[in-house]
């Protein structure tokens, strides 16, 4: 029996989050900063357990380099979900520990996350990054900060036949 298989764990299916600060569970001292993954358990059926591995400042690259995807791989099993939301930190060219090219390394990294889920009979779901709060002036929000990463994620979802949730 392989690690993470449905037979080795409780019957409860799990939703794993692999993401950045927009999903991270935050300490009460950072309130009102709240990640999606922090409140997500309030909106899922009780038979699902949410396993939030999201971490502030992570990109697809740094998440994998730090062993965070490996930690998910050791636990994920048949019938589980892997929600994958990155882009905010992948675009940081000034930081080689996080930066990925949208239409090459970013897409390749997303495919690694997808493969981990599928190799364990879990369901990968790609989720586009949220728009940054970058204002053009006092009233108007600028748009398009992540457009290449959103387009790359959409292409990856289509190529790999996996669902995509577009929050952009």
Task: List the predicted regions and their residue ranges.
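Serine-esterase "nucleophile elbow" of acetyl-processing enzymes
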Residues: 1-55, 70-78
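Short, solvent-exposed coil/turn linker segments
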Residues: 9, 58-59, 166
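Cell-envelope and extracellular/periplasmic
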Residues: 15-17, 21-23, 44-46, 53-59, ...
């Amino acid at each position: 029996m392989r690690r993470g298989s449905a037979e080795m764990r409780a019957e409860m299916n799990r939703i794993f989050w692999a993401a950045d600060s927009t999903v991270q569970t935050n300490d009460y001292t950072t309130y009102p900063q709240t990640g999606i993954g922090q409140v997500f358990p309030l909106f899922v059926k009780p038979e699902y357990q949410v396993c939030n591995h999201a971490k502030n400042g992570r990109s697809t690259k740094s998440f994998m380099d730090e062993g965070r995807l490996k930690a998910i791989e050791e636990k994920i099993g048949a019938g589980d979900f892997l929600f994958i939301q990155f882009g905010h930190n992948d675009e940081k060219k000034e930081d080689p520990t996080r930066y990925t090219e949208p239409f090459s390394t970013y897409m390749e990294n997303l495919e690694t996350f997808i493969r981990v889920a599928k190799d364990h009979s879990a369901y990968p779901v790609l989720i586009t990054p949220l728009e940054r709060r970058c204002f053009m002036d006092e009233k108007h929000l600028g748009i398009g900060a992540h457009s290449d990463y959103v387009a790359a994620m959409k292409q990856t979802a289509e190529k790999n036949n996996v669902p995509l949730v577009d929050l952009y």
